[in-house]
Amino acid sequence: ELKRIRYTTSHPRDFTNDLIQVHKDCEKLMPLIHLPVQSGSNNILENMNRKHTIEEYLNIIEKLKKIKPNIELSSDFIIGYPGETRHDFELTVELMKKIKFINAYSFIYSARPGTPAFNLKAVDVIHAKERLLTFQNISKKIKTEYRKKLLAKTIPILFENKTKDENKYFGRDEHFNSVIVESKE
C-alpha cells in the first residue's frame, strides 16, 4: 500500500486553489512543500520575471497553513541578483524569518550567457558573499530551532534502507528530514 506521496516542487504561479484543496483532501500527501520564491523583494522578483509577488506568495502559504497547520516549507533563494540593494536583501531576510523555511537553498547569483540578466550590473562579489553568509546563518538558526522541537518526540518514519553500519536504518519523516535509527530488527 502506498504510504506517502511527495512531489518535488511547484512554481508559485502554478499553485492554484485546486492544488491547495488536494493538500487538504489527500492525507497521503506529505506536509512539506518546496515553493521557490527566489527573493523577498517584489522589485527583484519583477526583474527576474518571476510572475508572482511576495503578497501572492504569502497568500498561498496562508491558505496552506489554514487547511493543514502542520505544513512546512522549503524554498530557493538567489542572493546578489543584479540590482539587489541592501533593502531588497533585508526584505528577503524578513521573509525568511516570517515563514521560517525549514530548508532554504541559497546561492549567489551567477551570470549565465544568453539570459536577460547576463548584461546587467552585478552586485559586488564581496557584498554578495556577505549577504549569503548572513542569510545562511539565519537559515541555520531557524532549522536548528525547528529540529529542537522534534527532540524526544515520537514521529512516523518511512524507512528506505539499511545503512553501512550494522543495525542502523535510514528513513525520512513526513517533512523529509533524514533519520537514522539503530535497531536489531
Regions found by a protein language model. Name each.
Residues 119-185:
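Terminal RNA-binding accessory module
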Residues 23-25, 92, 121-124:
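Short, hinge-like loop/turn segments at secondary-structure boundaries
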Residues 30-32, 72-74, 101-102, 152-154, ...:
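Active-site lining segments that contact anionic ligands and/or coordinate catalytic metals
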Residues 57, 89-92, 128:
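Aromatic/hydrophobic pocket-lining residues that form the small-molecule binding cavity
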Residues 1-86, 97:
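Conserved SAM/AdoMet-binding glycine-rich loop
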Residues 35, 76, 96, 104, ...:
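Hydrophobic, well-ordered secondary-structure elements that form the walls
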Residues 14-18, 37-48, 79-86, 102-128, ...:
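Flexible glycine/acidic-rich beta-alpha junction loops that bind and position SAM and/or redox cofactors
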